[in-house]
Amino acid sequence: MAGEKIGIAKDVTELIGNTPLVYLNNVVDGCVARVAAKLESMEPCSSVKDRIGYSMITDAEEKGLIKPGESVLIEPTSGNTGVGLAFMAAAKGYKLIITMPSSMSLERRIILRGFRSELVLTDPAKGMKGAISKAEEIKAKTPNSYILQQFENPANPKIHYETTGPEIWKGSNGKVDALASGIGTGGTITGSGKYLREQNPNVKLYGVEPVESAILSGGKPGPHKIQGIGAGFIPGVLEVNLIDDVVQVSSEESIEMAKLLALKEGLLVGISSGAAAAAAIKVAKRPENAGKLIVVIFPSFGERYLSSVLFETVRREAENMTVEP
């Protein structure tokens, strides 16, 4: 993990963490609270999942569960955890097999194959549950294999408790009043939230989920376009009792906000960042939050979504451009 001051990093793992916080200024009309984004899009492989890729592999090594050059790592993922594991596996010498719903962006497939990870696509109608089942099926017939289990692995929230939470506290000079985070595995809000609550019991925690798959709000799982959150079940690592409120955001809202963040803030981020921002802005408009500071997690960089609906219009424009004489 990244230290405060570093000359030349000994390897890529020392580049993880210590991502910046930045205020949102031009998409916050009507807000009575300030909103600052934690740019996890600036991790070495462009997402918050770089943290848990490091944490889960390191934890398993320390427990003697896996060994480079011998163990085969397996993980079901919507993509970013796969990438976080893929660069770690490449750096440490592991074979990695990823199972992923075929509905996830093409960029994810290309990046995973770029790290020479083996990729098995699963039925998108079965969501993450289908990817999990396929991972278990592969493990049963693969010697020396180990599933890292991001949805159940305590090393997931642990790294956020040890790094993300402290970074938010220090970066805000201890003035953070609330944290808003999309819920995929639940590791980010659980680990970061627990740390922030220990520093200030009054810190509010807001989870974000798709309105189309509002499990935490008592709804049913359903298809949506916010890749990375709304897995359709309540993950084992998520401590639901920590959360003060769950804010629902639609796929359309999330996509539009992600576009606005690029156009008005100069922040090229993914759809789940748009969802988190939309939710944080809703919270920042509530009268009881006047004068407060809300930190929102932006999980990933927009370039990973070029083939998705987020960039559909500009992609078509780019494809149809002609050469000027």
Curated annotation (Swiss-Prot):
Signal peptide: none annotated. The keyword Cytoplasm applies. Pfam families: PALP (PF00291). Pathway: Amino-acid biosynthesis; L-cysteine biosynthesis; L-cysteine from L-serine: step 2/2. Homodimer. The modification N6-(pyridoxal phosphate)lysine is found at residue 49. The keyword Transferase applies. It is found in: Cytoplasm. InterPro entries: Cys_synth, Cys_Synth/Cystath_Beta-Synth, CysK, P-phosphate_BS, TrpB-like_PALP, TrpB-like_PALP_sf. It comes from Solanum tuberosum. Its EC number is 2.5.1.47. One of its GO terms (molecular function) is cysteine synthase activity. CDD domains: CBS_like (cd01561). Keywords: Amino-acid biosynthesis, Cysteine biosynthesis, Cytoplasm, Pyridoxal phosphate, Transferase. SUPFAM superfamilies: Tryptophan synthase beta subunit-like PLP-dependent enzymes. This is Cysteine synthase. GO terms for biological process: cysteine biosynthetic process from serine. Pyridoxal 5'-phosphate binds at residues 80, 184-188, 272. It catalyses: O-acetyl-L-serine + hydrogen sulfide = L-cysteine + acetate.
